[in-house]
Design a protein with these regions (language model features):
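Extracytoplasmic loop-helix module adjacent to an early transmembrane segment
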Residues: 20-58, 70-74
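Transmembrane helices and adjacent periplasmic/lumenal helix-loop junctions
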Residues: 168-174
């Protein structure tokens, strides 16, 4: 029962923080980030059949463009889709930080530790008012840290599915 309360609080915190701190939020009239506008443009082009690096070019990897392309399907003229993805990413950061904390402490202590995660991932210049590529990669890195620490506690026995999932996350990062 308390885990659902924690999940709800993490989700609410994610919505509030992204709503206030991200230019992708509907409360901002325009997203002033040049990078985010570039990613959205390439993502929209992909959704219309253009081939990245051939028909349109920007220097980031295809995962970023796919993410923004999917965001454009949610809302073509705004960054609402991007804001929804940012909320999901911040929630994942909070949850994974909580899970890491639970490996070494009580639920209450892990919860408090997780509440500090946004302080570090949403600060300038790393967050830069939303949707930086680095921000989207935090869950992949935290997942690897969690799996490594948990494996250490269990004689380094890791399931094939966990290896596969971590491999997919590494593929996204690189």
């Amino acid at each position: 029962k308390s885990i659902f309360l924690i999940i709800g609080m993490f989700l609410l915190l994610s919505i509030v923080l992204i709503g206030l701190l991200s230019y992708s939020s509907p409360i901002y009239e325009f997203n002033y980030s040049g990078d985010n506008n570039n990613y959205m443009t390439v993502g929209k082009a992909m959704m219309h059949g253009f081939v990245p690096y051939k028909d349109v070019f920007e220097q980031k990897g295809p995962f970023v463009y796919l993410l923004y392309g999917l965001a454009s399907l949610i809302s073509f003229h705004t960054f609402l889709g991007s804001a929804i993805f940012e909320i999901a990413i911040l929630f994942a950061i909070l949850w994974l930080t909580f899970k890491i904390g639970k490996l070494f402490s009580s639920t209450k202590v892990a919860f408090v530790i997780a509440l500090f995660a946004p302080v570090f991932v949403l600060m300038e210049p790393y967050y830069s008012y939303g949707a930086t590529v680095e921000f989207f990669l935090y869950p992949a890195m935290l997942s690897l840290i969690y799996v490594s620490l948990k494996a250490q506690q269990h004689q380094f026995i890791i399931s094939k599915w966990t290896w596969y999932f971590q491999g997919c996350l590494v593929g996204i990062v690189f």
